[in-house]
């Protein structure tokens, strides 16, 4: 019984109106489900589409049902037949012809047949076009062509389904907030609501072709909203590359952006792709297209493989040819290397024996220290040759002599050959420089090294023997060759008279008069002494050395600057330098003590600064491998000192740096660049300086840096605490720009992707925030005045280890004098003893941060005191010389005008040591760390001395004067690491500038103990405008120009990332990053604001970013920027804001509503009414507001938006869109406020005149909006009919387009039904005759072309008129 009841209920629920029985569900769409049905009267199978009536009004429902009744009259083999409709309380059921094989979209699924070949697609698309030709002739636009709406029978016949009704359902459902349905097939004009036409179906046909060929339509990899955006934005959808030329041309015609340029369906049927490929349907099905397609794929794969083999062979041949060419090419011959041309022709493999001979080429006028050291090292090397190497060395020597004899001048041949024997013996011990690797990597590197690392080629074995003469032999004639024996082309390279000269710069030829200056002067001095009756011989050689020192002191060396014991008499100092150099180098071994390694490293650093030529000796004889071994020692002091030594060696010498990279130094140094809790900041700084050299020295070193994963290291330097890590942040910014400027095949987008993946974007935004705060503070306090009329130059220089600012030739640094026991010296910088700094610094040698003599380079006080105590006297300045400047500091310390209270003046800490160690009571990190990074302490022409407060009270002084002087120093210096561009200062001027810096330093030291400003979490000092605490001083100390320069660089970097591909942009669209970026809109100056807005605009062009921008309240943050009315860059700012808002709000109703809620409509009105060039962005947004929401429409009405719409009817381009917006406002006019606005006489007259004067090409598009207007408002319908619209409608019935005729008949019917005097309308306009002519023309078939729906509509309207006439 229960089973029978269940069965009865089942059948009852499946029966529709006792006429159809519902079966299984066979499909599902946006507005309903499709079931198979059985006609209970005749047994026919039908398809029944079930549509919910929940969101459809009664009036719209009646219209849809009337449309279905009209479509029942259509009959064509390529369209699905409408059979009728049935309505229940909850659903509308549309009865359709059943097509048994289902849709093409279902057939091409991967689990079925998969994609179709072009031949089969041609068969199906030809039938689709046939169906469209019929529909368009009947005045019907399908509006939803896609694979799911193309059904097939088992005979292969194609039928178009779901035409006409689906779109009306969409229009009837005003609860939708965006374009719904199937966006991937939509034409741009459909998405933009600018008028649907028959050409919209042609666009959809193109999308369907790609769907059948690939299983998915264009942009299917995107979400629906981004896809809609791309359809509108892109010039054409992506077309697969593998298609034939004919089908590609066909698709390009379908995808014409302008709908008026697309061909109609009938024209496309005659396209070569369709015409050439059409064949009998059954024939095409008998021959499996899929099999043919697979065969074609296999054959094409074989061809590809053959082509690839040819490419490989071609590349291999090319490589062989390049190798042959390289092996035959001659290396450039420069200067002293001119006798090596034959050897240079050897292949790279020969360089294993001969490639290291570059050290034979140092000129005879090399400095004595280097020459004597060469002698000792060569002798020791010769003695240590192993027996196993003798045979090889002899062969090499004989071969070497054979090459060189023909090239060397005859009078030097014997000496040069003997010298080469000694040189090669030395190299065979293993101390040669790694030129072999350099050659294989870069021919330029070898040439540069031969120029940079030169040993005396003109000194033969005799000369080396004579250097070891007994002390009593003081004969000078054999020390130098006669001037006429010096080979031409030799250059004077050993001179270091200019402090900024580097080894590379020694390559340039010197004037002829400069050759052998040292020998000439020494000979002249000896001759003078002999003429005076004195002799050059002495038992102890003292007179000889005095003569040599006199010449050297004037010409080559500043002996007082050397780091040796000042108590040693001059006659004994010279040989001690060579001995000391050898001793220091020999101490650089892992088995030495920590103190010994550190001491030797720092002494070598000091020596290299005074004698840059010694670097070549060190590199030639030792290389970088011993230093790399020392870096493996897990001791901070050793690592710091060795890194400092490496930096000094490679400083400004690209060849040394490149060869250091070749032996693997980059990854090793990188390991010290990252942040670790137990790693001192000074080690990171040394590593950072080395990496900066890599970025700025040459493209080759930059490439090696990048290839060693250098970009993540640069990202790590963007520390959050900008005040504390300013140099590293600047390094990272400059380094990233160097990477981006690298001109290589690698795409810049790849670099962006690597950096973004490693978290650079959030760091850049935080840095932007910090720099903007720094710039703001500097602006509030007022930037420094420049006494000489020059403004501080914005720089992006290096973390120079020397901070050069003084020329050794012109002056020696001037410092505040202290008791001798309180200071030590190292190279040109001073250092406080532990006694002075113990109250503020830890003396722990494992924390080099605390021992910081020059602001950015580490020194170890306890070691340097021992290493450099011998040269204290060099830079001493008497107390009397500094009395005035020290007096000035007192008034500064008292803070008379700046509010710096003095507490414990006797214990004021040095400025830089103050920055390295925080007071115990301070809780906030980096409170005054800006001072530590004062521009000008970082990079100038000589090391700034350590600045620290004096115990003596100072008087006089003016803070503004000091800051002006300081800003001048800060603004100068190297530009991009070029030492030679730095200005020169006289001794007097430089002393004054140093005094100014010293006074600032002491004042900052005092202020730091009482400063009231604190740093934010990002390390930026926050202070009130006009504050007299430390913020004002810090703002001066950090040049506004410098901070602004880096602020712009960071903004430009963000812009680069915003322009990158979607993957990079996705990293930029995190919620926290965007929120932080938008917060800066009100904090930055217009130039930076414009760049941030450009970033936002670029992000908005990517559909995948729109949702993230919306979540970050981009619309809310952008709109206030439209309030800017005057000032710099206002137009550009408005342009970026409107463009971004346009991209965000286009298509999406929710975002349009959000924009309206945030007050965009008044701004849009202003741009439109003022006829601004930005009107192109404002108008679409303003018209979209009518479609957004009830609230947006209310705001439109309140701000006069309806009047703007009416005025746009005179604009040919915007008239159709404006009319559609008017129709939408009326359709949703609940309280009739919009209706009242349009019932005004002026509004009615504008609408009538617009209809009358509408251009022909727009006429078809305005009929549907007019139909909406008169069907939604009876009052406007009547008013328009009485004011001249009716005659215009009837007069246009002779239009030949079926779509136009059909809509005109609908309009006439709507007007007739609401007209107050229908009989008068019929008689005055002779309407029955007009309709009869339509029906008769249709019967003749001459003009109307079989327009079934037009005939049906005219006939039904004529019947209605006849009834009214009778009544």
Swiss-Prot record:
Residue spans of biased composition, Basic and acidic residues class: 293-306, 397-408, 475-491, 846-859
Residues annotated for ATP binding in this entry: 26-34, 49
Entry annotated with the keyword Cytoplasm: yes
Subcellular locations according to the entry: Cytoplasm, Cytoskeleton, Microtubule organizing center; Nucleus, Nucleolus; Cell membrane
PTM section of the record: Autophosphorylated.
Catalytic activity: L-seryl-[protein] + ATP = O-phospho-L-seryl-[protein] + ADP + H(+); L-threonyl-[protein] + ATP = O-phospho-L-threonyl-[protein] + ADP + H(+)
Function: Serine/threonine-protein kinase involved in the spatial and temporal control system organizing cortical activities in mitotic and postmitotic cells. Required for the normal functioning of the plasma membrane in developing pollen. Involved in the regulation of cell expansion and embryo development.
Family to which this protein belongs: Belongs to the protein kinase superfamily. Ser/Thr protein kinase family.
Protein name: MAP3K epsilon protein kinase 2
């Amino acid at each position: 019984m229960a089973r029978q009841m269940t069965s009865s209920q089942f059948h009852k629920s499946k029966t529709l109106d006792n006429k159809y029985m519902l079966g299984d569900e066979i499909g599902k769409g946006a507005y309903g489900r499709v079931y198979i049905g059985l006609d209970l009267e005749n047994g026919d199978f039908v398809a029944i589409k079930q549509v919910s009536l929940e969101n459809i009004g009664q009036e719209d429902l009646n219209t849809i049902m009337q449309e279905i009744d009209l479509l029942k009259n259509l009959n064509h083999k390529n369209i699905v037949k409408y059979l009728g409709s049935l309505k229940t309380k909850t659903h509308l059921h549309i009865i359709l012809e059943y097509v048994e094989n289902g849709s093409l979209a279902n057939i091409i699924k991967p689990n079925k047949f998969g994609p179709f070949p072009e031949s089969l697609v041609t068969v199906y698309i030809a039938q689709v076009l046939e169906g469209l030709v019929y529909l368009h002739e009947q005045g019907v636009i399908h509006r939803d062509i896609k694979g799911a709406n193309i059904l097939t029978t088992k005979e292969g016949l194609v039928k178009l389904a779901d035409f006409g009704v689906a779109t009306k359902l969409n229009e009837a459902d005003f609860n939708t907030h965006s374009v719904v349905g199937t966006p991937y097939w939509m034409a741009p004009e459909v998405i933009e609501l600018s008028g649907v036409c028959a050409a919209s179906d042609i666009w959809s046909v193109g999308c369907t072709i790609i769907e059948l060929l690939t299983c998915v339509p264009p942009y299917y990899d995107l979400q629906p909203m981004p896809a809609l955006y791309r359809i509108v934005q892109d010039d054409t959808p992506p077309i697969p590359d593998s298609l034939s030329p004919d089908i590609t041309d066909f698709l390009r015609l379908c995808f014409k952006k302008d709908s008026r340029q697309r061909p109609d369906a009938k024209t496309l049927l005659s396209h070569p792709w369709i015409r050439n490929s059409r064949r009998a349907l059954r024939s095409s099905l008998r021959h499996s297209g899929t099999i043919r397609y697979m065969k074609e794929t296999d054959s094409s794969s074989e061809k590809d493989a053959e082509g690839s083999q040819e490419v490989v062979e071609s590349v291999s041949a090319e490589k062989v040819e390049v190798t042959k060419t390289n092996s035959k090419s001659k290396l450039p011959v420069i200067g002293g290397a001119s006798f090596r041309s034959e050897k240079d022709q050897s292949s790279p493999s020969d360089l294993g024996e001969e490639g290291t001979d570059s050290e034979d080429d140092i000129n005879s006028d090399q400095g004595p220290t280097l020459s004597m050291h060469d002698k000792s090292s060569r002798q020791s090397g010769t003695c240590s040759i192993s027996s196993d190497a003798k045979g090889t060395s002899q062969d090499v020597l004989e071969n070497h002599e054979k090459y060189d004899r023909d090239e060397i001048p005859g009078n030097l041949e014997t000496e040069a050959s003997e010298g080469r024997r000694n040189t090669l013996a030395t190299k065979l011990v293993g101390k040669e420089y790694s030129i072999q690797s350099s050659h294989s990597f870069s021919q330029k590197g070898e040439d540069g090294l031969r120029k940079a690392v030169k040993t005396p080629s003109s000194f033969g074995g005799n000369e080396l023997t004579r250097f070891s003469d007994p002390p009593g032999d003081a004969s000078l004639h054999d020390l130098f060759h006669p001037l006429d024996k010096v080979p031409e082309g030799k250059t004077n390279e050993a001179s270091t008279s200019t402090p900024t000269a580097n080894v590379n710069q020694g390559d340039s030829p010197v004037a002829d008069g400069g050759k052998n200056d040292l020998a000439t002067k020494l000979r002249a001095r000896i001759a003078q002494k002999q003429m005076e009756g004195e002799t050059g011989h002495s038992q102890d050689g003292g007179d000889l050395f005095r003569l040599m020192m006199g010449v050297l002191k004037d010409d080559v060396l500043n002996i007082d600057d050397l780091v040796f014991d000042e108590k040693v008499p001059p006659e004994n100092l010279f040989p001690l330098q060579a001995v000391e150099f050898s001793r220091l180098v020999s101490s650089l071994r892992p088995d030495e003590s920590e103190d010994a390694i550190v001491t030797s490293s720092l002494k070598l650093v000091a020596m290299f600064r005074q004698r840059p030529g010694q670097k070549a000796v060190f590199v030639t004889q030792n290389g970088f491998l011993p230093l790399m071994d020392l870096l493996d020692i897990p001791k901070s002091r050793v690592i710091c000192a060795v890194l400092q030594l490496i930096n000094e060696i490679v400083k400004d010498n690209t060849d040394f740096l490149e060869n250091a990279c070749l032996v693997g130094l980059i990854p090793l140094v990188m390991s010290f660049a990252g942040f670790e809790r137990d790693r001192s900041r000074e080690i990171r700084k040394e590593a950072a300086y080395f990496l900066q050299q890599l970025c700025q020295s040459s493209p080759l070193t930059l490439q090696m840096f990048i290839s060693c994963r250098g970009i993540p290291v640069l990202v790590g330097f963007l520390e959050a605490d900008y005040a504390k890590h300013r140099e590293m942040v600047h390094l990272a910014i400059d380094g990233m720009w160097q990477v981006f400027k690298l001109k290589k095949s690698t795409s810049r987008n790849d670099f962006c992707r690597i950096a973004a993946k490693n978290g650079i974007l959030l760091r850049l935004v935080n840095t932007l925030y910090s720099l903007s705060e720094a710039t703001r503070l500097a602006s509030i306090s007022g930037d420094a005045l420049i006494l000489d009329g020059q403004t501080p130059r914005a720089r992006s220089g290096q973390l120079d280890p020397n901070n050069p600012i003084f020329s050794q030739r012109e002056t020696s640094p001037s410092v505040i004098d202290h008791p001798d026991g309180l200071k030590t010296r190292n190279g040109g910088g001073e250092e406080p003893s532990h006694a002075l700094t113990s109250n503020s610094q830890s003396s722990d040698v494992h924390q080099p941060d605390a021992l910081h003599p020059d602001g950015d380079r580490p020194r170890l006080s306890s070691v340097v005191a021992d290493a450099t105590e011998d040269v204290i006297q060099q830079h001493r300045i008497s107390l009397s010389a500094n009395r005035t400047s020290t007096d000035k500091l007192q008034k500064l310390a008292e803070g008379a005008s700046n509010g710096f209270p003095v507490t414990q003046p006797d214990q004021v800490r040095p400025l830089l040591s103050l920055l390295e160690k925080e007071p115990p009571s301070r809780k906030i990190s980096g409170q005054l760390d800006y001072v530590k990074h004062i521009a000008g302490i970082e990079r100038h022409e000589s090391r700034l001395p350590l600045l620290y407060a004096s115990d003596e009270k100072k008087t006089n002084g003016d803070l503004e004067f000091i800051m002006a002087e300081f800003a001048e120093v800060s603004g100068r210096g190297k530009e991009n690491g070029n030492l030679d561009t730095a200005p020169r200062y006289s001794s007097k001027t430089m002393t004054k500038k140093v005094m100014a810096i010293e006074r600032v330093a002491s004042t900052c030291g005092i202020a730091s103990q009482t400063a009231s400003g604190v740093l934010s979490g990002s390390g930026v000092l926050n202070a009130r405008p006009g504050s007299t605490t430390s913020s004002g001083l810090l703002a001066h100390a950090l040049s506004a120009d410098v901070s602004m320069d880096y602020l712009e660089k960071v903004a430009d970097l963000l812009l680069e990332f915003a322009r990158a591909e979607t993957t990079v942009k996705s990293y930029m669209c995190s919620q926290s990053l965007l929120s932080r970026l938008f917060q800066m809109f009100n904090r930055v100056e217009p130039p930076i604001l414009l760049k941030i807005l450009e970033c936002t605009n670029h992000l908005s062009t990517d559909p995948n970013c729109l949702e993230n921008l919306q979540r970050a309240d981009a619309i809310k943050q952008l709109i206030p920027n439209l309030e800017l009315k005057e000032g710099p860059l206002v137009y550009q700012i408005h342009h970026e804001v409107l463009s971004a808002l346009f991209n965000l709000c286009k298509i999406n109703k929710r975002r349009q509503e959000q924009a309206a809620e945030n007050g965009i409509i008044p701004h849009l009105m202003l741009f439109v009414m003022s006829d601004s060039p930005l009107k192109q962005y404002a108008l679409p947004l303003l018209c979209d507001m009518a479609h957004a929401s009830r609230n947006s429409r209310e705001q439109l009405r309140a701000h006069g938006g309806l009047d703007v719409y009416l005025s746009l009817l005179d604009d040919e381009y915007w008239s159709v869109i404006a009319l559609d917006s008017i129709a939408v406002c009326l359709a949703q006019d609940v309280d009739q406020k919009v209706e009242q606005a349009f019932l005004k006489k002026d509004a009615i007259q504008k609408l009538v005149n617009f209809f009358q004067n509408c251009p022909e090409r727009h006429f078809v598009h305005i009929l549907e909006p007019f139909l909406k207007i008169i069907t939604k408002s009876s009052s406007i319908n009547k008013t328009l009919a009485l004011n001249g619209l009716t005659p215009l409608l009837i007069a246009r019935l002779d239009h030949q387009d079926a779509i136009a005729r059909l809509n005109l008949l609908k309009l006439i019917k709507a007007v007739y039904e609401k007209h107050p005097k229908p009989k008068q309308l019929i008689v005055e306009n002779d309407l029955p005759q007009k309709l009869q002519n339509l029906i008769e023309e249709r019967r003749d078939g001459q003009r109307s072309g079989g327009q079934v729906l037009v005939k049906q509509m005219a006939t039904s309207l004529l019947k209605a008129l006849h009834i009214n006439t009778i009544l």
